[in-house]
Amino acid sequence: MTTIRVKENEPFDVALRRFKRTIEKLGLLTDLRAREFYEKPTAERKRKKAAAVKRHYKRVRSMQLPKKMY
């Protein structure tokens, strides 16, 4: 369970922002969304494989030299 201590004279907005940032760092929302519905193991493997391919091509594209514009 994630908790934050609200400091004295701290606005609610700031405390809420700190809480959201903590939740984001822990990855709780992404984990919760992933577990919201059952995903078959084959579908999960397929999704992860597609994400890995996408990351690979993105890395390759970033390493290429830019085309010269004449």
From Swiss-Prot:
Top-level division of the source organism's lineage: Bacteria
Record flagged with keyword Ribosomal protein: yes
Keyword Ribonucleoprotein included in the entry's annotation: yes
Listed GO biological process terms: translation
PANTHER family per the UniProt record, alphabetical: MITOCHONDRIAL 28S RIBOSOMAL PROTEIN S21, SMALL RIBOSOMAL SUBUNIT PROTEIN BS21
Similarity comment: Belongs to the bacterial ribosomal protein bS21 family.
Protein name: Small ribosomal subunit protein bS21
Organism the protein comes from: Verminephrobacter eiseniae (strain EF01-2)
